[in-house]
């Protein structure tokens, strides 16, 4: 069997649920969050601790639909939490600002593309490595 065949045979498309999970705070409540992230987190049994969106009414509606108790009024209020995973579901034009405000030593999930340009993507990567 070739190396490539061995690699393909051993690829996994499913992974075990972690034994210890962290609450998730979602920044941005657009279609991908409503249609994919929240249903997936619910199915996996992951706790969504809160939502933030510049359109608070949209975040409030989604929180009610998914029984999420906290809707934050600002990035800063959401980012005051440190023992969680941040799901940044933002348009590329807003990602750099959010990443700059992230607390240090946390985990974050990013949507693609990672910035509007290669330079902006590299800037975001550098900020992440510093934090």
Feature locations, PLM:
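Polar low-complexity intrinsically disordered regions
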Residues: 1-2, 130
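N-terminal Rossmann-like dinucleotide-binding module
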Residues: 2-66
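Generic detector of bulky aromatic hydrophobic side chains
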Residues: 12-14, 34, 41, 49, ...
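Beta-loop-alpha module in the N-terminal Rossmann-like domain of NAD(P)-dependent dehydrogenases
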Residues: 66, 70-127
């Amino acid at each position: 069997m070739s190396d490539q065949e061995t690699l393909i045979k051993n690829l996994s498309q499913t992974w075990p649920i972690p034994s210890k999970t962290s609450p998730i705070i979602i920044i941005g409540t657009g279609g991908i969050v409503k249609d994919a992230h929240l249903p997936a987190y619910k199915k996996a049994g992951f706790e969504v601790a809160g939502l933030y969106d510049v359109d608070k009414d949209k975040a409030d509606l989604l929180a009610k639909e998914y029984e999420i108790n906290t809707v934050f009024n600002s990035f800063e209020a959401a980012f005051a939490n440190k023992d969680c995973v941040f799901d940044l579901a933002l348009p590329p034009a807003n990602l750099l600002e959010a990443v700059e405000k992230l607390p240090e030593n946390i985990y974050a999930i990013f949507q693609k593309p990672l910035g509007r340009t290669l330079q902006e993507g590299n800037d975001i990567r550098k900020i992440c490595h510093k934090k």
